[in-house]
UniProtKB/Swiss-Prot annotation:
Stretches that traverse the bilayer: none
Protein family per UniProt: Belongs to the bacterial ribosomal protein bL17 family.
Gene3D superfamilies linked to this entry: Ribosomal protein L17
GO annotation, cellular component aspect: cytosolic large ribosomal subunit
Keyword list, A-Z: Ribonucleoprotein, Ribosomal protein
GO molecular function, one term: structural constituent of ribosome
Known partners and oligomeric status: Part of the 50S ribosomal subunit. Contacts protein L32.
One of the protein's GO biological processes: translation
SUPFAM superfamilies from the UniProt entry: Prokaryotic ribosomal protein L17
Superkingdom: Bacteria
Protein name in the entry: Large ribosomal subunit protein bL17
C-alpha cells in the first residue's frame, strides 16, 4: 500500500525524472507559459514557485541554489532581476493552471501552466 507517499514517478529512473522536472521548470521560467499534461504540471508547479521565491530572497546562497537547479544561467538572471520585482508584493501563487481538455493521441488531460502577469 502506498499510503501518504507523495510525488509521481512517471515510469522513469530518478535521474531522468529530475532532469525532466528541471527542463520543464526552465522552460516555464523562460517562456512564462507551457502546455503539458496535468500530472506533470502539478509536479513542477511547486518547484517553479520555489525558484521565484529564491529570486525574491535575492541572497547569494539563494542564487547558487537556483543555479544548481535551473539549466540556463540566463534564466536565473531573469528570475532574480525581472520576476522577483514582478512578484515582490505577492506572497505566493505565481502560477495558473488552465485545463485544455484531453490530448488527441492518447487522451491525456492537458493544461496550460503559466506565470501570472
Amino acid at each position: 500500500m502506498r499510503h501518504k507517499v507523495s510525488g509521481r514517478r512517471f515510469d522513469r529512473p530518478t535521474g531522468q525524472r529530475m532532469s525532466l522536472y528541471r527542463n520543464l521548470v526552465t522552460d516555464l521560467l523562460n517562456y512564462e507559459e507551457i502546455t503539458i499534461s496535468e500530472p506533470r504540471a502539478k509536479e513542477i508547479r511547486s518547484m517553479a514557485e520555489k525558484m521565484i521565491t529564491l529570486g525574491k530572497k535575492g541572497t547569494l546562497a539563494s542564487r547558487r541554489r537556483a543555479l544548481a537547479f535551473v539549466y540556463m544561467p540566463g534564466i536565473v538572471e531573469k528570475v532574480f532581476e525581472d520576476l522577483s520585482k514582478r512578484y515582490a508584493e505577492r506572497p505566493g501563487g505565481y502560477t495558473r493552471m488552465t485545463k485544455l481538455g484531453p490530448r488527441q493521441g492518447d487522451g491525456a488531460e492537458m493544461v496550460k501552466l503559466e506565470l501570472i502577469k
